[in-house]
């Protein structure tokens, strides 16, 4: 599968130029939200939202997985996938929670790559349940970027290094027809009186709505690190279609394998 990335590459490069001096953020572990010692996390960390999913991934896919964090019930594990050291930890729900955990992993634990793995609601007819969306960029209705005191609007963009690797993995796994590369919306709200407002984003090419990606992308840009958002379509907001809990678990395994294969390729 070959994709054209020039518009998004421009955004990524412009973000890197803006945030090329991350050194003032560095601090030592443990942090207020992670009780793991220095060196406990691998250079690549997978972040599902749900702590139970983090445990499930560690038990099913990692070898010699060790619990390295359990503060607030947010379980983090480090183990090996195909001989490559990989960590998995929950991020919680929403941009504030993702913002905290990704910030501390990048800046206190010297993690280089974070791959978010989670669910998304589709808002376009050409997207189907169980499709995997790779977020080249994340728009938002949040004011998360105001924390960076930028005189303008910054795009939340994936790292080209990770986009390239995941594209190679998708082709190798033969998932070209199921994996979609494009834009997502990171929303501040799950429940809203004006649900049709989310659907308006589809007119701008946005594929689906989730709640974490934008903060991850900005934290990665500010720290000079790499981030990627992988999501499985669990809900279709136009067709009113939804996966059951059992269907989610089975369907999400494919996305998890894509993320782990990408992590292994980064070694």
Predicted features and spans:
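Metabolite-binding pocket within alpha/beta catalytic cores that recognizes anionic/polar moieties
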Residues: 18-165
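His/Asp/Glu-rich mid-to-C-terminal helical/loop segments that flank catalytic regions of hydrolases
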Residues: 237-267
């Amino acid at each position: 599968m070959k994709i054209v990335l020039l518009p998004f590459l421009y955004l990524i490069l412009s973000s890197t130029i803006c945030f090329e001096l991350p050194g003032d953020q560095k601090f030592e572990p443990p942090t207020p939200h992670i009780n793991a010692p220095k060196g406990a996390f691998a250079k690549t960390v997978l972040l599902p939202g749900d702590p139970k999913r983090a445990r499930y991934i560690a038990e099913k896919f990692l070898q010699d997985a060790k619990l390295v964090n359990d503060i607030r019930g947010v379980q983090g594990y480090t183990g090996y996938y195909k001989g490559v050291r990989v960590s998995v930890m929950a991020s919680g729900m929403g941009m504030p929670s993702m913002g905290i955990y990704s910030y501390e992993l990048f800046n206190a634990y010297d993690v280089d790559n974070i791959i978010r793995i989670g669910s998304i609601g589709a808002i376009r007819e050409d997207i189907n349940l169980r499709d995997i969306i790779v977020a080249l960029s994340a728009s938002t209705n949040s004011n998360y970027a105001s924390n960076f005191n930028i005189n303008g609007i910054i795009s939340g963009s994936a790292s080209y290094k990770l986009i390239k690797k995941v594209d190679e993995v998708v082709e190798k796994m033969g998932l070209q027809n199921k994996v979609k590369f494009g834009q997502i919306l990171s929303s501040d709200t799950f429940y809203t009186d004006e649900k049709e407002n989310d659907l308006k984003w589809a007119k701008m090419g946005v594929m689906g709505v989730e709640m974490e990606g934008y903060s991850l992308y900005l934290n990665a840009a500010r720290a000079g690190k790499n981030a990627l958002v992988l999501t499985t379509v669990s809900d279709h907001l136009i067709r009113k279609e939804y996966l059951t809990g059992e269907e989610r678990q089975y369907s999400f395994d494919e996305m998890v394998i894509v993320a782990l294969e990408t992590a292994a390729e980064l070694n």
